[in-house]
Amino acid sequence: MEDINFSSLAPRHGTRPYMGTWNEIGTSQLNGGAFNWNSIWSGLKNFGSTIKTYGTKAWNSQTGQMLRDKLKDQNFQQKVVDGLASGINGVVDIANQAVQKKIANRLEPRPDEVMVEEKLPPLETVPGSVPTKGEKRPRPDAEETLVTHTTEPPSYEEAIKQGAALSPTTYPMTKPILPMATRVYGKNENVPMTLELPPLPEPTIADPVGSVPVASVPVASTVSRPAVRPVAVASLRNPRSSNWQSTLNSIVGLGVKSLKRRRCY
């Protein structure tokens, strides 16, 4: 423990640490002397006793005796008592008057509030804008009249009759979708469907000498398949020359992935 320097933990004034004689900072022992309440109380007691001593000497002196006799002749004590009594009576009378006034104000009936109607100023009338009583509004010469006609929907029975009178349609009412389209048959629905094939050429077989006759083999008829649509292949309209600038322009991404690591040594 002796090797540890505690000066870095002490309060400082600039670069100077407060240690040793400065350990009493924040206590009652301030710089310049101790602050003691007992010394203050003893000083007040000494001051009071000194005043009492001088007052007793002045009251018992000859001048004090003459002053007392003069005050007795003028009835000073009675005047002081009368003044105090009159002051107290005046204060009591003022308070009593204030209380009586408050009580009287509360007991008095409140007068009924009279509702006064506000008189509005007369409206300013523009001549010719509003027709007076007894006058009719002039009718314009070319006044348009609108006539509306309402058409009611047919009844249920009439709608059924109109629907039965219409001939059924043999064609689709909407535009067909090619993958889902089917043939719509008309009146001749029972006629069987036939597949018309082109005539096949007759095969010609050469008869070699001394050959054995070979039985004719039936040839299967080939059915024509629908033509396959060519598949569209995307091609560049303006092919650029393959250089490093076009390669950089065609690169899409966020760039080189980098990773930062902070290490403490």
UniProtKB/Swiss-Prot annotation:
Record region (Interaction with hexon protein): 48-74, 248-254
Lineage top rank: taxon: Viruses
Region annotation Involved in endosomal membrane lysis: where it falls in the sequence: 36-53
Renumbered residue ranges of the record's region Amphipathic alpha-helix essential for membrane lytic activity: 34-54
GO term, biological process aspect, one: microtubule-dependent intracellular transport of viral material towards nucleus
Ranges for region Disordered: 123-155
Site for Cleavage, residues: 33-34, 254-255
Additional notes on this entry: All late proteins expressed from the major late promoter are produced by alternative splicing and alternative polyadenylation of the same gene giving rise to non-overlapping ORFs. A leader sequence is present in the N-terminus of all these mRNAs and is recognized by the viral shutoff protein to provide expression although conventional translation via ribosome scanning from the cap has been shut off in the host cell.
Domain description: N-terminal amphipathic alpha-helix domain is essential for the membrane lytic activity. Late-budding domains (L domains) are short sequence motifs essential for viral particle release. They can occur individually or in close proximity within structural proteins. They interacts with sorting cellular proteins of the multivesicular body (MVB) pathway. Most of these proteins are class E vacuolar protein sorting factors belonging to ESCRT-I, ESCRT-II or ESCRT-III complexes. Minor capsid protein 6 contains one L domain: a PPXY motif which binds to the WW domains of HECT (homologous to E6-AP C-terminus) E3 ubiquitin ligases, like NEDD4.
Protein's recorded name: Pre-protein VI
Organism field: Human adenovirus A serotype 12 (HAdV-12)
Taxonomy of the source species: Viruses, Varidnaviria, Bamfordvirae, Preplasmiviricota, Tectiliviricetes
